[in-house]
């Protein structure tokens, strides 16, 4: 937490914790999402260990799959408890923005149970971006011990990146073949080929942010294509979902000093999972196969937001 002492962000020590409200017990708290003293997870509760957190996540998903959810609603006293006592989430989940993948629901969780971060493709592409900074906040300040990167079947971002990679690969092959044929031809044309024509007015447009997002995921599709040689577009995209989960985990281990150090010390665990939209089940993948290699790397680690804050302090 000292990493953030000069950032202006609230620390657990600065959060006001008042005595438990006497009428909270009169509400029906359901079975909750891990142990809680006020019916909801707040700073009154102790952080759960990584192993405890993963067990709670697994149990919640089993209830979701079976249609036996226990989270229930929030009464007025529970809402006041969350507003007054701060947050102590069980785990941090990096999920996809897909509207069909409601992270809290598929783990049978309520407000205050999970610290959820979502974007298209459940990915981290910038060492100093808001996603990395938010994960650091969750482990350094909120004291979550489990970070779960959650991909899902049928991911549109991954499919888009896969199609983009395959289209570019095909176009590159065509261009290389055409260039080779032109060079070997004895009948050289004086006219410029289509590849040498200057761009026409209006044909070049500024690259969209969406295309930039897909570009960042193209290496994932490329790796999946190599590992699944000869696979169909759908098969490659399905495999790329897992590849992308590992890539996000490896990115966090490589570019966040806070996360890297907490994982190395055993205080925090970083694991992957994939949500099956058809069955509702979450496949827990465990730790990255490259975790030990990345933690043993002695080279320069690009400072993350928290790392910079620590260097300045």
What is each model feature region?
Residues 90, 152, 276:
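Acidic active-site catalytic centers that drive phospho-/nucleotidyl reactions
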Residues 88-91, 96:
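Glycine/small-residue-rich phosphate/adenosyl-binding loop
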Residues 100-117:
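Catalytic core of membrane glycerolipid acyltransferases/transacylases, capturing the structured
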Residues 2-86, 111, 121-145, 156-313:
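Divalent-metal-activated hydrolytic enzyme cores
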Residues 95-100, 120-123, 152-155:
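Short glycine-enriched loops at secondary-structure junctions
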Residues 73-75, 98, 102:
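Poly-acidic low-complexity segments
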């Amino acid at each position: 937490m000292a990493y953030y002492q000069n950032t202006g962000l609230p620390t657990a020590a600065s959060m006001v914790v008042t005595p438990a409200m006497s009428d909270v017990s009169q509400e029906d708290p359901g079975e909750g999402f891990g142990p809680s003293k006020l019916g909801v997870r707040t700073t009154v509760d102790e952080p759960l260990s990584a192993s405890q957190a993963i067990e709670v996540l697994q149990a919640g998903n089993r209830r979701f799959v079976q249609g036996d959810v226990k989270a229930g609603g929030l009464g007025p006293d529970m809402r006041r408890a969350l507003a007054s006592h701060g947050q102590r989430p069980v785990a941090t989940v990096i999920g996809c923005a897909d509207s069909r993948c409601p992270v809290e629901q598929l783990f049978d969780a309520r407000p205050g149970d999970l610290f959820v971060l979502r974007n298209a493709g459940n990915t981290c592409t910038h060492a100093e971006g808001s996603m990395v900074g938010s994960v650091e906040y969750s482990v350094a300040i909120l004291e979550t011990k489990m970070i779960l990167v959650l991909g899902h079947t049928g991911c549109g971002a991954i499919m888009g990146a896969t199609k983009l990679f395959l289209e570019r690969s095909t176009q590159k092959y065509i261009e290389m073949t055409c260039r080779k044929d032109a060079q070997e031809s004895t009948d050289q044309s004086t006219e410029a080929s289509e590849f040498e024509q200057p761009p026409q007015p209006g044909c070049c447009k500024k690259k969209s942010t969406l295309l930039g997002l897909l570009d960042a995921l193209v290496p994932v599709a490329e790796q999946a294509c190599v590992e699944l040689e000869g696979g169909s577009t759908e098969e490659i995209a399905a495999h790329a979902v897992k590849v992308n989960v590992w890539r996000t985990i490896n990115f966090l281990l490589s570019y966040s000093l806070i996360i890297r150090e907490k994982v190395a010390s055993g205080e925090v665990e970083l694991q992957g999972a994939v949500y099956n939209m058809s069955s509702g089940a979450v496949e827990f993948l465990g730790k990255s196969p490259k975790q030990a290699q990345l933690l043993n790397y002695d080279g320069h680690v690009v400072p993350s937001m928290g790392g910079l804050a620590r260097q300045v302090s």
